[in-house]
């Protein structure tokens, strides 16, 4: 599983990290300083805000928006939009907490 698969018309911001085994669909926008961990599966037409974190083997359904500094926990199945600074986890994913801006500023 050492490969990353990215299909057409996906745009990456500066300093994006994509780990092995990740699949990324078409027509996505991935914001600067985002980290996508191993085995994540990202659908198509998704807008991921800057500074976001996609956990190990998380799945994100197509046509969604993840706000700046949002987080998808390990194994999360994201089927709804995520707001800025929100942490979602589970299957289907639910809001677990909202980051305090002091926490975001320290990352």
What role is predicted for each listed range?
Residues 1-89, 93-96:
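Structural signal for interior beta-strand "rungs" in well-ordered beta-sheet cores
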Residues 91-107:
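Terminal amphipathic alpha-helical/low-complexity segments used for targeting or macromolecular assembly
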């Amino acid at each position: 599983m050492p490969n990353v698969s990215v299909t057409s018309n996906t745009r990456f911001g500066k300093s994006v990290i994509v780990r092995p085994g990740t699949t990324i669909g078409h027509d996505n926008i991935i914001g600067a300083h985002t980290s996508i961990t191993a085995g994540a599966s990202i659908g198509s037409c998704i807008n991921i805000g800057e500074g976001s974190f996609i956990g190990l083997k998380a799945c994100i359904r197509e046509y969604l928006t993840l706000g700046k500094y949002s987080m998808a926990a390990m194994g999360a199945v994201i089927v709804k939009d995520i707001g800025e600074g929100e942490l979602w986890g589970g299957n289907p994913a639910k809001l677990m907490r909202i980051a305090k801006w002091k926490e975001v500023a320290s990352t």
